[in-house]
């Protein structure tokens, strides 16, 4: 959610910032007009409430003196009726304002490049050497099916398209990755592990910016609960409607969960394999910080996600996303892209974002200043995938494949896999 005070003070700047996020037809004029109507109605309500209070006091005084007060009672009823009418009008204007602001993305941070799509993203750094194969490498789905450990056909019969069944050592690899990632984030980066529900209320989705904009991309149950598209929804809402002591910040959470997305806008993209699924596992990071901490926290969070890839010895690069390619709630985002040799390109495996106060305003989460407890500020929220399990399996299979179709298990994972060193056909 946006700060209406900021829009009032700099409507042209706000308009330009929103347009850079891809909302080309946006104008701040409508917001200011609705805001003006709402404020005028609020002023009228305040005056009427004051007048009614004065009349009420006069009625009390007259009754104490046993004087006639019929006219004052009549006036009080008239004022009350007018208050009810204007209150409804004020609420209508409030709803209009919230509806418009709720559908506008966050404003980019100052150092975010302006651009419309991924072609304007900026490479920050690379890590690792790309493996040179002495044979023609295969796609992960070819390897998985030949190993008899990855079953797309039966998954489609059971659930439809964009689902996968993993068996044997590949299922074990997924479990190993979950344990490895969580242990790394908890032990080396001081995140608190959380186990949480996979179903949430609409309010929780709204708080993080998933609703109302992306309503069609989530799965809604008959009793109006939604399957989470990411653990970010729950982890961020752990502090909803709270006022936190500044000394308690930053707060850091991590969780593994299954995630569910309709992928409504992905028709025809990545139709084979595990890159884009309706259900996928992911380890998520969420941080709640002060205004001054959030910039450094984004770098720290990105480093935590990077550390997983470094330990797995997978080549990757860090991309700073442009204004038009960032997620709805983000003000600055780093994408981590892992190298996939068969595709001969880097593919996103993690996204780490600083959302500033955007989510905090929606869920009303603030912190007391240590130096002045009368002053409260909105917290900053950050989130990052560290990492997506399915895409990490893809990266391991394609980078660690052998000429006979087997897959070498990265050294760091072998202790989680009964000291196995190779995934081979059983």
From Swiss-Prot:
ATP binds at residues 261-263, 348-351. It is found in: Cytoplasm. One of its GO terms (biological process) is seryl-tRNA aminoacylation. SUPFAM superfamilies: Class II aaRS and biotin synthetases, tRNA-binding arm. It catalyses: tRNA(Ser) + L-serine + ATP = L-seryl-tRNA(Ser) + AMP + diphosphate + H(+); tRNA(Sec) + L-serine + ATP = L-seryl-tRNA(Sec) + AMP + diphosphate + H(+). GO terms for cellular component: cytoplasm. Belongs to the class-II aminoacyl-tRNA synthetase family. Type-1 seryl-tRNA synthetase subfamily. Catalyzes the attachment of serine to tRNA(Ser). Is also able to aminoacylate tRNA(Sec) with serine, to form the misacylated tRNA L-seryl-tRNA(Sec), which will be further converted into selenocysteinyl-tRNA(Sec). This is Serine--tRNA ligase. It comes from Wolbachia pipientis subsp. Culex pipiens (strain wPip).
């Amino acid at each position: 959610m946006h700060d209406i005070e900021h829009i009032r003070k700099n409507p042209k700047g706000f308009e330009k910032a929103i347009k850079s996020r891809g909302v080309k037809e946006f104008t701040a004029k409508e917001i200011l007009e609705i805001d003006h109507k709402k404020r005028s109605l609020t002023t009228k309500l305040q005056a009427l409430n004051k007048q009614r209070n004065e009349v009420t006091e006069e009625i009390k005084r007259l009754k104490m003196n046993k004087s006639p007060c019929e006219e004052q009672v009549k006036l009080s009823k008239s004022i009350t009726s007018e208050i009810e009418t204007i209150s409804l009008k004020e609420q209508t204007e409030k709803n209009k304002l919230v509806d418009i602001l709720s559908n506008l993305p966050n404003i980019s941070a100052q150092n975010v490049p302006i651009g419309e799509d991924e072609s304007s993203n900026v490479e920050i750094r690379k890590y690792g050497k790309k493996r040179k194969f002495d044979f023609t490498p295969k796609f992960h789905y070819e390897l998985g099916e030949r190993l008899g450990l990855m079953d797309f056909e039966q998954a489609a019969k059971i659930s439809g398209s964009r689902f996968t069944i993993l068996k044997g050592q590949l299922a074990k690899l997924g479990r190993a990755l979950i344990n490895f990632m969580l242990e790394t984030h908890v032990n080396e980066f001081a995140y608190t592990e959380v186990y949480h529900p996979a179903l949430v209320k609409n309010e929780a989705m709204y708080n993080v910016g998933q609703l109302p904009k992306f309503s069609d991309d989530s799965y809604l149950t008959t009793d109006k609960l939604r399957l989470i598209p990411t653990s970010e929804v729950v982890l961020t809402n752990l502090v909803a409607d709270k006022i936190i002591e500044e000394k308690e910040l930053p707060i850091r959470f991590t969780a593994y969960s299954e995630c569910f997305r309709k992928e409504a806008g992905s028709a025809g993209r990545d139709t084979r394999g595990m890159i884009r699924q309706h259900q996928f596992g992911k380890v998520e990071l969420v941080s709640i910080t002060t205004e001054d901490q959030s910039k450094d926290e984004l770098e720290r969070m990105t480093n935590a996600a990077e550390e997983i890839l470094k330990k797995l010895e997978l080549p990757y690069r860090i991309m700073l996303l442009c204004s038009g390619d960032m997620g709805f709630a983000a003000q600055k985002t780093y994408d981590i892209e892992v190298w996939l040799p068969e595709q001969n390109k880097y593919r996103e495996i993690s996204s780490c974002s600083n959302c500033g106060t955007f989510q905090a305003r929606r869920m009303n989460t603030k912190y007391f200043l240590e130096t002045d407890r009368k002053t409260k500020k909105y917290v900053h929220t950050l989130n990052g995938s560290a990492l997506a399990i399915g895409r990490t399996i893809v990266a391991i299979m394609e980078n660690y494949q052998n000429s006979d179709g087997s897959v070498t298990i990265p050294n760091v994972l072998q202790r989680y896999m009964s000291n196995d060193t190779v995934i081979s056909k059983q």
